[in-house]
Amino acid sequence: MSRLVLASFLLLAIFSMLVGGFGGFGGFGGLGGRGKCPSNEIFSRCDGRCQRFCPNVVPKPLCIKICAPGCVCRLGYLRNKKKVCVPRSKCG
């Protein structure tokens, strides 16, 4: 049983690195360091893979809770369909 759990964990880790590109998913949360994030975004040492999206964005991208550096929307901003951080009021 423990071998199955270990193998599953390793496969999940490899999959998350391949999908996430070692720092983001789907074109955001890149490897850029502090000061290199796009407008309305901040660098986070541990939240780069899991993003907050506007309610009308369906389906939501996969969020794997593995600590990864990357750019995330500032407080009060959410990602729209174009993956740009916009004020919550402009989600549409």
Curated annotation (Swiss-Prot):
Expressed by the venom gland. The keyword Disulfide bond applies. Keywords: Allergen, Disulfide bond, Protease inhibitor, Secreted, Serine protease inhibitor, Signal. GO terms for cellular component: extracellular region. Residues 1-21 form the signal peptide. Disulfide bonds join 37-71, 46-67, 50-63, 54-91, 73-85. InterPro entries: Ser_inhib-like_sf, SerProtInhib-TIL_Domain, TIL_dom. GO terms for molecular function: serine-type endopeptidase inhibitor activity. The keyword Signal applies. PANTHER family: ACCESSORY GLAND PROTEIN ACP62F-RELATED, RIDDLE. Belongs to the serine protease inhibitor-like (TIL domain-containing) family. May act as a protease inhibitor. This is Allergen Api m 6.03 / Api m 6.04. It comes from Apis mellifera (Honeybee).
